[in-house]
Amino acid sequence: MASLFAQEILSQEILGDFEKTFSTEVCPDDLENTIYTLLKENYSSSCSEASTELKQQTTYKPRILTLANDIYNFFNHELPQMLLDYDDALDVLCTLDVCRFAMDSPSNAYSHLAAKHPANVKIGVDTDLLYADNNDGLKALYYFVNANRAISYDFYDNTLMRTLNTIVVKDRVAIICALDQYNRVNVASVIFDPEKVNQIYVRTLPAFRTSDLLAHATEQLEFYQHGYRTDFYTKDNFQFLLTLGFEYLLPQECWDKIINVAREEYHDEFMALIVAQLQITWEEIFEKNTLDFYVLKSSLMKYIDDGEIIFADVIYHMTPEERKLHIENVLALSKKNRNIQFYVVDDEQLVNKQQMIHFSIFNNRKKLFLKNPGRYHTDVGPYFYSVLSNQLIQRISSYLDDLKNADYCSHYDAESLQTFYDKYSSLVHRMIDLSAFKK
């Protein structure tokens, strides 16, 4: 072909036009070789483009999962690892019921996975399961949040999205599921084509309506901007489940030091002001309000040993002497206000669950939020969850009330607390003193 093209160009005396078109200079004797080279390069380029297109088509070929074992492996192994392997933040929609998933899966199923980047998930909740009288759905959801505390979830009532059966990771992957009569995945179609994935994302997003939001992940700034925490303490009936230290009923000797940490170490005048305001607010609350403190036995022992508390958003380590003063102040204030009650939860009796309790719960029966102490030592995950649903708040309140009667929960009022302290004070003081030598 190169020879025929060369002969035709020379016979028509259009060599100059050829040189202009291909931006080259060529003598008649070299024309055939030049045309051959151009044809060869163009052929190689077109083959490369065709190969790339073919590879893309292969990459984007959907997967159809029909075998129970394949479905289990995909959702429990492949998909979590796939999400972790991505290099940037993830935006996920899931219309499937998280309560059913949490109840059917081991609570520590993903405990070996560590997220390296932010993941924000909007997910559906079957409120029939969540509000069931046996509390199985409620407990499963709490353990699920704890086990996946590096992921930020927004939980929605899934009443209007139950037929969608869709999971979509924006720009990445979409999974369309067919469910059996027990709402378990029977068939799953996995789509990788980014264009199709994002079309599915756009079609699915409207199902997550603001009016259906039950609880959502919240960052520090958002939590303070609208005075949420200040307003929270204006009520008079509190339930606190504390999973790290005991930041309440602090002695006066600690307040200025915590304020100074906020101001000098955090360089945060706003947080220093928040701490100072809470000091005044809490002094009033502790005088007469009803307060039920639920404290994990494991976190209480850890506090005696290391003195770590997180006051508002300030990490503070109580000195051995401050811890002793703290105990004395707790005893004194609980005697002044008989509405202060303590419940020690022996989390070691919660088989396979004791390592799954990380989020503290702060509840005044009108407003409720969860706090993630671990977030103050990592770069991913939510600081707080704000619960918006009044029905969910009442369900959690009722569950905490019932927790008082559990075999693994010990009740202490002012008298029994003093009796316990009189019996074990020397041991507690020795433990506190020994902790100073571990530094």
Feature locations, PLM:
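Extended, compositionally biased accessory segments flanking or bridging domains
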Residues: 25-91
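Hydrophobic protein-protein interaction segments
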Residues: 61-411
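Charge-biased C-terminal accessory regions appended to nucleic-acid-, cytoskeletal NTPase
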Residues: 390, 395-439
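Surface-exposed polar/charged interaction patches
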Residues: 7, 41, 333-336, 427-430, ...
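Basic, Lys/Arg-rich alpha-helical nucleic-acid-recognition elements, primarily the DNA-binding modules
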Residues: 1-20
